[in-house]
């Protein structure tokens, strides 16, 4: 994934420029969080590498005991299955959240702020490319391009 982010760096920045051009607010802090320049893409690459270097979180024993009746109880870490994250317009979260979810064996449903739609879709495209190149299905990482009402409907009935 880090290699793909590097290869697609200019396309990521170009997609982000579309988001920045369409940004209609005067909230400087939000604009700064939305911005994905060369430095921010470098940070995304570094975050992928940092997660890669972490120990595998799956199957670690948390505790283990034998009950007096002989039953053995072992508590091990395991994936949740599928998680969803709803976040503001910060394209780097698309990379960081998906990295952590994938590393921990979870599928992830991403819903970023509407202001970062072009950036997020490009970053999810990068994820799908990385998954495909490694013989995995793209359903590990999915992006919901939903408005507020459709998001709330999904949360009421997540099918």
Where are these regions (language model features)?
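Rossmann-like NAD(P) dinucleotide-binding subdomain of oxidoreductase/dehydrogenase enzymes
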Residues: 53, 61-159
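N-terminal Rossmann-like NAD(P)+-binding subdomain of aldehyde/semialdehyde dehydrogenases
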Residues: 1-73
């Amino acid at each position: 994934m880090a290699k793909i982010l590097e290869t697609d760096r200019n396309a990521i920045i170009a997609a982000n420029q579309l988001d920045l051009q369409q940004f209609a607010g005067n909230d400087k802090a939000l604009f700064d969080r939305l911005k994905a320049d060369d430095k921010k893409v470098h940070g995304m690459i570094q975050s992928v590498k940092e997660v890669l270097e972490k120990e595998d979180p799956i199957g670690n024993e948390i505790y283990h005991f034998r009950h007096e009746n002989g039953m053995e109880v072992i508590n091990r870490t395991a994936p949740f299955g599928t998680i969803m994250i709803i976040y503001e317009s910060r394209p780097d979260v698309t990379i960081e959240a998906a990295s952590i979810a994938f590393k921990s064996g979870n599928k992830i449903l991403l819903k970023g702020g509407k202001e970062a739609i072009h950036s997020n879709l490009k970053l999810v495209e990068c994820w799908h490319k990385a998954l495909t190149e490694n013989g995995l299905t793209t359903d590990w990482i999915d992006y919901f391009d939903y408005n507020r009402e459709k998001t709330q409907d999904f949360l009421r009935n997540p099918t």
